[in-house]
Amino acid sequence: MAFGKKPDFKKKPAQNPLFKRKRYCRFTVAGVEQIDYKDVDTLKDFIGENAKITPARLTGTKAKYQRQLDTAIKRARYLALLPFSDQHKK
């Protein structure tokens, strides 16, 4: 019977081999008011391997701080504190 009732298969929750932690905003926890472009060590944590800014949905950063982070990274790149791309490493 091609149009008969399908058997009930219970779906198992997808088991992710990597443990995902709950994301939280590091700047809210630390009580940061303004993100400084001169704090290069903090900014490097929010830049991926290919020198792209990591989105807030992956880092857990709130929208207010993500905008400040975006501006701070762009200023640091303009002042040559951070690289624009990873091409120069080759």
Curated annotation (Swiss-Prot):
Under NCBIfam families, the record lists: S18
Task: Tell me the Pfam families matching this sequence.
Answer: Ribosomal_S18
* Entry's Gene Ontology cellular component terms: cytosolic small ribosomal subunit
SUBUNIT field: Part of the 30S ribosomal subunit. Forms a tight heterodimer with protein bS6.
Q: What does this protein do?
A: Binds as a heterodimer with protein bS6 to the central domain of the 16S rRNA, where it helps stabilize the platform of the 30S subunit.
Concerning its family, UniProt says: Belongs to the bacterial ribosomal protein bS18 family.
What's an example of a GO molecular-function annotation for this chain? small ribosomal subunit rRNA binding
Q: Does the keyword Signal apply?
A: no
In terms of InterPro entries, this protein maps to: Ribosomal_bS18 (IPR001648), Ribosomal_bS18_CS (IPR018275), Ribosomal_bS18_sf (IPR036870)
| Protein name as annotated | Small ribosomal subunit protein bS18
Q: Which UniProt keywords apply?
A: Ribonucleoprotein, Ribosomal protein, RNA-binding, rRNA-binding
